[in-house]
Amino acid sequence: MSNLYESIRKYKCGYIEEILNILDMFDPLLNKFQRNSCYEDMKSELSLFMFNLIDNFPLEKDCFKEDKFIINYIYKSLKNKFIQVNKLHQKVKSYETNIDIIWVNNCDYANLLSTVIFEDIIKDLTQNEKNILRKIYLHGLRESEISRELNISRQAVNKTHLRALEKLKKLIN
């Protein structure tokens, strides 16, 4: 096994084939992450990430003159990317499950897409604010109907509705 620092330096100087040697060095780690994931394209995702990682690698730092620091840096970066991709994949799977449930209920795709986007937008609000916004915008209920359903005043519903919209406005800006 050649010096990892030298391989990265050569790759950055234009020896493109060095990236294959670097990928071969980390192939067991990529395979491990692939086995530990439900996502079938995990190895490809991490390999592409490694290309970007090596391209932007900070070789000028003195601590990266030794292989042990480079290996640790790449390992931690790959692990963080693995976690990020897994979370994203689980979120997509969750949405797909919701899509299947909604399709069973004969919902159209445009409505489904807007519902998924709506849920993603309101994720940072309180449960009460989410509930009121869902009833107003997804179910088409008026504030007076919501107030009767929740046994609170119409003014309380209106105040919560406006507060939620203000929070969303701040989040967007």
Curated annotation (Swiss-Prot):
GO biological process: DNA-templated transcription initiation
MF-aspect GO terms: DNA binding; sigma factor activity
InterPro entries, per database record: RNA_pol_sigma-70_dom, RNA_pol_sigma70_r4, RNA_pol_sigma_r3/r4-like
Keywords: DNA-binding, Sigma factor, Transcription, Transcription regulation
Record flagged with keyword Metal-binding: no
Sequence segments annotated as region (Sigma-70 factor domain-4): 122-169
DNA-binding region: 143-162
Pfam families the record matches: Sigma70_r4
Record function comment: Sigma factors are initiation factors that promote the attachment of RNA polymerase to specific initiation sites and are then released. Transcriptional regulator specifically required to activate expression of the toxin gene locus, composed of tcsL and tcdE/utxA.
Family, as annotated: Belongs to the sigma-70 factor family.
Name recorded for this polypeptide: RNA polymerase sigma factor TcsR
Protein source organism: Paraclostridium sordellii
Lineage, highest ranks first: Bacteria, Bacillati, Bacillota, Clostridia, Peptostreptococcales
